[in-house]
Each structure stands twice: as C-alpha cells, then as structure tokens.
Amino acid sequence: MRLLISGGGTGGHIYPALALIEAIKQKEPDSEILYVGTHKGLESRIVPSAGVPLKTIKIQGFKRSLSLENFKTVYLFLKSVHDCKKIIRDFKPDVVVGTGGYVCGAVVYAAARMKIPTFVHEQNSVAGVTNKFLSRFVDKVGICFEDARKDFPASKVVFTGNPRAQQVAGMKDTGRLEKEYKLRKDLPTVMIFGGSRGAEGINAAALKAIPQFAKKEYQVLFVTGKVHYDKIMAKDEAKNLPDNVRIEPYIADMPAILPEVASIVGRAGATSLAEITALGIPTILIPSPYVTNDHQTKNAMSLVNKDAALMIKEKDLTADILVKNVDKIMNDSDKRLQMGKNAKEAGIPDAANQVIKVLEDIMHK
C-alpha cells in the first residue's frame, strides 16, 4: 500500500495517524508512507522522530470571528491545494487519509479532486470543522463515538474506533511503578494526570487532597506536567510527602505504564479514552472546559452512560470532591472490576485493523 496521510496541530490528530501507520507496516512491511503536515505543528517534531517521512505545506486555520486573516487563510488554502497536487502526483498514493486538523483539509481535498480514494478519521464525539468540510468529498468517514455520526453523510460513516487503542491493547505490566517510582506492588494505584502540559484545576485539587490521600489504603501517582512541576513542589502540601503519594513532572511513554494503574483521574481527550478503554481502566474524567464545542464532556458522557467512568465538571472540582470520587473506585474492588469490564466493552482494541479494512475496500471498489 502507498499511503499518504495528514493530520496535525495536536497530538490527538497525530498519534492515531502514527498508530495506523504502525499497523499498516506490521501487516504490509513493504508499504510506502508519506506524512504531510506543517512546519509549525507538533507533527514537525513527532512524525520524523517516529521514523516516518514528512513533507510540509504552508497553511493556517480559519479564525472563528470575522477577520482579514481569513482572506490570507483562503489564499494559503488554495495555494496549498496546488502544492498538495504536486506532492500527490510525485508520490502516487493508493489512498489518502486525513486524521483532522486544518492541514489535512488541503491534502485530502486535493486528493479527492484527483479521484484518489480518500478517508477521514474523526476522533471526537463532535466533528471538527475540517472533517465536516471534507466529508462532502471523501469516500468514507471513520468515527469513534456514535454522537459523531449525525455530523456526516450517513452513507459514508463507518464506526472504526481509534487506531491508538490497538497500539496499547496488548501492553503488559512491566513493574515500572515499583522500579522507577518506588510504589508498592501490593497496593492499588490511582494516577492523576492533566494531560502532557498538565491542568491547573486538576493540579490544584490534587495538591490540596494530599493530606487526605495520606490516610488511604491506596497509592497516588500525581503527574503535574513539566510546566507546573516546580510551582507545585514549592507548595507546603508537596513537602514531606507521605509514602503512598508520588509527584512526577511527566512520565515517558505514558501508555506503557497504564496496565499497572488501578484507575485514572484525567481529561476526556479522544486519544486518552481510546487507551483507557483498550485496557479496561476505570476513570474519573474531568473534561477540559477550554475545547471547541465542549466535546470532551460529550466524550466523557459516552463512558459515564456505560458505567465505565465517573465525571466531575472542572467548575465543581475541589479536593474533597476529588477524594470522594477516588474513594468510590479505589475503596471498592468489585466496583473497580465492573467499571473496568464496562470500559473494555466500550473499546475497540482492533481499531487500526478496522480502518485498514475500510482503506482496502475503497481502494478496490
């Protein structure tokens, strides 16, 4: 398979693309892959470090308010479509995939106009602007949440799940909690994590909760995010930590540690939920209030409604409420087991293979 793939801006668009690439390479080692992104986006660093060839185009997203910048955006879009057609002619892909972010708009649109099989993947419960626009031109649209179905032409929608799930589904306990973080193997661990950059609201509540956590029969691994770590460690609550609480700035290769944790407190981003459900981990979700269309709340509700997660709105989050919810899961092993089972049933552990099947179908239609 010759695959041209594009997605950028945030890790939520990039990591599913890389997971799909990995699955294709496992299935067809001779496959040729080309990733198209922007030189400013996260993809310019993440994609080459994953060993995937990258070409960049110049493009920018629309401003949501009326702005003269939008005229520049239209100009750059038209120019980048022209540039993408040249990239496509040179690479000669069998299929073109977009995983979201404005960069994939020009790439997938150009491919569709050139009559090349095209597919877009929507990770969230509320469709992004770019994927909504592209859905009129592509052959198929992959979704991860039933709520997203209504945003696309019904005949094009396929429920595939998130390829990232397949990447983590087979991961095993490697004892990192004990070896690297000096936590006990005989006590269950809850990980509190606000995303790669951390989250001030979650951090503030977790910090204030430390005196209560000190009295519990479970352990807490509190990951602050690098930018917040020094500030957190300067607080009184972070001094003389109890034996059952560890504070870390970040965790390298986070998914690899997930099989060792009994439960997670964190955001409700699409990639996180794909990983959590693939492994069947009960969670307390605190949706980010700063995302478009409040899509993280809708993501979270898909698991809350299946009794696979609890949810706290950030505006309601306090140390007491955090501890009360963590206790509900960590002090009740039967509940934890059932929530984990429900989470696993909500996941699609072979999501990358599901996407590959759709790609093969549209290539051979």
Curated annotation (Swiss-Prot):
Which CDD domains does this entry report, sorted A to Z?
GT28_MurG (cd03785)
GO annotation, biological process? carbohydrate metabolic process; cell division; cell wall organization; lipid glycosylation; peptidoglycan biosynthetic process; regulation of cell shape
Taken from the UniProt record, the cysteine pairs bridged by disulfide bonds within this chain are none
Q: Membrane topology for this entry?
A: Peripheral membrane protein
Give the UniProt subcellular location, in the record's own words: Cell membrane
Q: What is its EC number?
A: 2.4.1.227
The family line of this record is: Belongs to the glycosyltransferase 28 family. MurG subfamily.
Q: What is this protein called?
A: UDP-N-acetylglucosamine--N-acetylmuramyl-(pentapeptide) pyrophosphoryl-undecaprenol N-acetylglucosamine transferase
Species of the source? Ligilactobacillus salivarius (strain UCC118) (Lactobacillus salivarius)
